[in-house]
UniProtKB/Swiss-Prot annotation:
The modification Phosphotyrosine is found at Y343. This is Band 4.1-like protein 1. Residues 483-541 are annotated as: Spectrin--actin-binding. Residues 97-378 form the FERM domain. GO terms for molecular function: actin binding; signaling receptor binding; structural molecule activity. It comes from Rattus norvegicus. May function to confer stability and plasticity to neuronal membrane via multiple interactions, including the spectrin-actin-based cytoskeleton, integral membrane channels and membrane-associated guanylate kinases. Pfam families: 4_1_CTD, FA, FERM_C, FERM_M, FERM_N, SAB. Gene3D superfamilies: 1.20.80.10, Phosphatidylinositol 3-kinase Catalytic Subunit, Chain A, domain 1 (3.10.20.90), Pleckstrin-homology domain (PH domain)/Phosphotyrosine-binding domain (PTB) (2.30.29.30). It is found in: Cytoplasm, Cytoskeleton.
């Protein structure tokens, strides 16, 4: 488009189009203002010139000529085209703001960001400055007018989030990785260590004296390197901070431990630091002040597995993400809707009172982000549409599954970075593919502070391991080489958060006591692919790597779908997924078992660190009622030689209870335990491969398999009942006789949380409050007699055993907490005599498989036997 110039053309245009006069006059009299801001004089001038449009054309000509002298390109200003923009927008310059970010090492980073820039722009600048690629675990925080910490939303403009004039931010960890060893790069672990050290110093991560010393020694090793007698003299750690109340005794203990580390690089020291810190009860818990319905001050903690409730620094409840149907807030109230249990009809809503509306919204956002990051495979897109009920806020970053996949693709040399006060080993050594074993001092338990979500059952018992306790199971961990199944199923790897490894020791102690009770010296923690000599090692010996060569962490294997370690199977045709070598070894071991005539209890050490069903913390009161008709009470505690003399040549390897764990229907599997999976229902078909797949799932619970010969003269009618306390008392006469003997086989190997309440047989142990009930079901009973080949789960032979199961569930609510007692009565009958010890142990094992989170408190057995033909002949003769 061309523009006419000169006085004649301007006069002509001004006379023809008088509406252009106000615009030209306004352009002359109004100073240039920033874009988006209108000067008040402009509006007044426009209004004045519009009302009085009687000025001659020569005045506009003079004004426009004056504008030509003042600015270039005025011809565009006088063109009548509506497509032309004002000169203010043409001359617009983007304004920038100075951002000051406090990093994790207490240094500050300043940068210029566009004033209308989004939070993601600033976050990317900080991560680029830090040379950080695994940045999804981190975030930026700022303080509002109430000095409350808020997370900077990367999808919104910065100026709309922060109101204060100086833009000050802090770079912190937003999502604490459940397993820091899976981080790919040393620099990521280094910044995580800095965050944890800051949490410990400020008291947000409480721990004991021993833990302070252990973590402090690794921090010193990472910063100062190996101990040097010439350089490190006196109290050389006094300048470093390790605890909120640092004492001389703590510093001396740290120096003693530091002297023992030789040749440990800073990267290795940081890995040991993180391996211990992740077991702390408050690791990764974001606390928020609130009040409950009664107005009592509580703390709401948000973590990877769900929502935690604390009162007086003690965790009183836990709601896992799969149990939460909906989270919402209204004004200053925060609500969570809980999924109904198996025996409940409606959902329940729990409300909390927060200090103000902003606090409720802040907590709601944190819950949304944590749930999306740790539980979902990909972030949920925000709702679209003009009218949308509720907030449109959604987490917009990458989830943990996506960031692990992206981290596996990182292929760059280990970045160089200088640690805070490091005097040696400043070059970060890449640990990709390297294996390390944690020293004995790492096996410390941390019970200080509120109970965290990874330690669900052991925290109530209050046990504390020493830092050099036996039984530490730690196998090598690979850092960079992530297996495909670990990447594609990230949610299953979350399950290991629920229980730490100290639960393993309690189960081992239970096995030891069971071993003494049954006079069996060879009760061991057994791996499927070990040879028999290694299976006879002590239970405290560490586990060997898995056959596949994958990193075998007891906490991680509970969530991954691997083969079961149960050995209750006779020699049979190899299943498609089994190995030829494994099958041969299994047959040889079966022969050894039957030859020794021993009651061997097989258990896998990693199966003890199983994640419990997310929010189910009730315990079961199992009553196996023992009443003997037609014979005197037979002592369960008699030694194995006595049992061996009563045995005949007929042999069996026990009953295999195929199980089907039913959970609430959800798009998400339980974050800490029973999961809805297509593999769970595999036992409904009678083919052998499906049955094998069900056995492969039993690794996620404590597996207890028992082999024994059958007693010819007795038929066992075993009833594992689950009932109310009144029903338990109904079987008290027989229960009292049973509990006078020490057959702790029934409960000692299954109890994980409470004290030994089995020796007293009067009543049940104290209940653990839990919000919901466990949903389980026994689908089929598969008898395996002798060496017959299992062809159908319903195959009937002359020796087939039949069962009938009756379940009673009693639930009481006290003070907002529900107590659940399940009494399950199992009656086993058959044409063949049944080994009472074997059937009892298998019944208890099946109960534990169905209710992994609940405690078996009582087991009593009724035994009914029909008189033998000789006895029938004797009775008429005597009469």
């Amino acid at each position: 488009m061309t523009t006419e110039t000169g006085p004649d053309s301007e006069v002509k245009k001004a006379q023809e189009e008088t509406p252009q006069q106000p615009e030209a006059a306004a352009a002359v009299t109004t100073p240039v203002t920033p874009a988006g801001h209108s000067h008040p004089e402009t509006n007044s001038n426009e209004k004045h010139l519009t009302q009085q449009d009687t000025r001659p054309a020569e005045q506009s000509l003079d004004m426009e000529e004056k504008d030509y002298c003042e600015a270039d390109g005025l011809s565009e200003r006088t063109t009548p085209s509506k497509a032309q923009k004002s000169p203010q927008k043409i001359a617009k310059k983007f304004k920038s703001a100075t951002c000051r970010v406090t990093l994790l090492d207490a240094s500050e980073y300043e940068c210029e960001v566009e004033k209308h820039g989004r939070g993601q722009v600033l976050f990317d600048l900080v991560c680029e400055h830090l040379n950080l690629l695994e940045k999804d675990y981190f975030g930026l925080t700022f303080c509002d007018a109430d000095s409350q910490k808020n997370w900077l939303d990367p999808s919104k403009e910065i100026k709309k989030q922060i109101r204060s004039s100086p833009w000050n931010f802090a770079f912190t960890v937003k999502f604490y990785p459940p397993d820091p060893a899976q981080l790919t790069e040393d620099i990521t672990r280094y910044y995580l260590c800095l965050q944890l050290r800051a949490d410990i110093i400020t008291g947000r991560l409480p721990c004991s004296f021993v833990t302070h010393a252990l973590l402090g020694s690794y921090a010193v090793q990472a910063e100062l390197g190996d101990h040097d007698t010439e350089e490190h003299v006196g109290n050389y750690v006094s300048e470093l901070r390790f605890a909120p109340n640092q004492t001389r005794e703590l510093e001396e203990r740290i120096m003693e431990l530091h002297k023992t580390y030789r040749g440990m690089t800073p990267g290795e020291a940081e890995i040991h630091f993180l391996e211990n810190a992740k077991k702390l009860s408050m690791y990764g818990v974001d606390l928020h002040h609130a009040k409950d319905s009664e107005g009592i001050d509580i703390m709401l903690g948000v973590c990877a597995n769900g929502l935690l409730i604390y009162r007086d620094r003690l965790r009183i409840n836990r709601f896992a993400w799969p149990k939460i149907l909906k989270i919402s807030y209204k004004r200053s109230n925060f609500y969570i809707k809980i999924r109904p249990g198996e025996y409940e009809q409606f959902e329940s809503t729990i409300g909390f009172k927060l200090p103000n509306h902003r606090s409720a919204k802040r907590l709601w956002k944190v819950c949304i982000e944590h749930h999306t990051f740790f539980r979902l495979v990909s972030p949920e897109p925000p709702p679209k549409g003009f009218l949308v009920m509720g907030s449109k806020f959604r987490y917009s970053g990458r989830t943990q599954a996506q960031t692990r996949q992206a981290s596996a693709l990182i292929d760059r040399p280990a970045p160089f970075f200088e640690r805070s006060s490091s005097k040696r080993y400043t070059m970060s050594r890449s640990l990709d593919g390297a294996e390390f074993s944690r020293p004995a001092s790492v096996s410390e338990n941390h019970d200080a502070g509120p109970d965290g979500d990874k330690r669900e059952d052991d925290a109530e018992s209050g046990g504390r391991r020493s830092e050099a306790e036996e039984g530490e199971v730690r196998t090598p961990t690979k850092i960079k080489e992530l297996k495909p199944e670990q990447e594609t199923t990230p949610r299953h790897k979350q399950e290991f958060l629920d229980k730490p490894e100290d639960v393993l020791l309690k189960h081992q102690a239970s096995i030891n006591e069971l071993k003494r009770t049954l006079k069996e010296p060879n009760s061991k923690l057994i791996h499927r692919d070990r040879d028999w000599e290694r299976e006879r090692r002590l239970p405290s010996s560490p586990a060997s790597p898995s056959p596949k060569g994958t990193p075998e962490k007891a906490s991680e294997r509970a969530g991954l779908r691997e083969g079961s370690e149960e050995k209750v199977k006779p020699p049979r045709p190899r299943a498609p997924e089994s190995d030829t070598g494994d099958e041969d070894q299994d047959q040889e071991r079966d022969a050894v078992f039957l030859k020794d005539n021993h009651l061997a209890i097989e258990r896998k050490c990693s199966s003890i660190t199983v994640s419990s069903t997310s929010s189910l913390e009730a315990e079961v009161d199992f009553t196996v009622i023992g009443d003997y008709h037609g014979g005197a009470f037979e002592d369960f505690s008699r030694s194995l030689p006595e049992l061996d003399r009563d045995k005949s040549d007929s042999e069996t390897e026990g009953l295999v209870f195929a199980r089907d764990l039913k959970g609430p229907s959800s798009q998400e599997d339980e974050s800490g335990g029973i999961e809805d999976s297509p593999d769970r229902g595999a036992c409904s078909t009678p083919e052998l491969p499906q049955f094998e797949s069900v056995k492969a799932e039993t690794m996620t619970v404590s597996s207890l398999a028992i082999r024994k010969k059958i007693e010819p003269e007795a038929m066992l009618q075993s009833r594992v009942s689950t009932a109310d306390s009144t029903q338990v008392d109904g079987g008290a006469p027989a229960a009292k006789d049973f509990m006078t003997t020490p057959p702790c086989i029934t409960t000692e190997t299954i109890s994980t949380t409470m004290e030994n309440s089995l020796k007293s047989g009067k009543g049940a142990a104290a209940m653990i409050p839990g919000p919901q009930t466990v949903a389980t079901e026994i689908r089929s009973l598969s008898p395996i007699i002798g060496k017959d080949v299992l062809t159908s789960t319903y195959g009937a032979t002359a020796e087939t055993l039949s069962t009938s199961t009756t379940t009673h569930v009693t639930k009481t609510v006290k003070g907002g907490f529900s107590e659940t007692r399940i009494e399950k009565r199992i009656i086993i009958t058959g044409d063949e005599d049944v080994d009472q010890d074997q059937a009892l142990a298998l019944a208890i094992k099946e109960a534990k498989l169905q209710h992994p989170d609940m405690l078996v408190t009582k087991a009593v057995v009724y035994r009914e036997t029909d008189p033998s033909p000789e006895e029938r002949d004797k009775k008429p003769q005597e009469s």
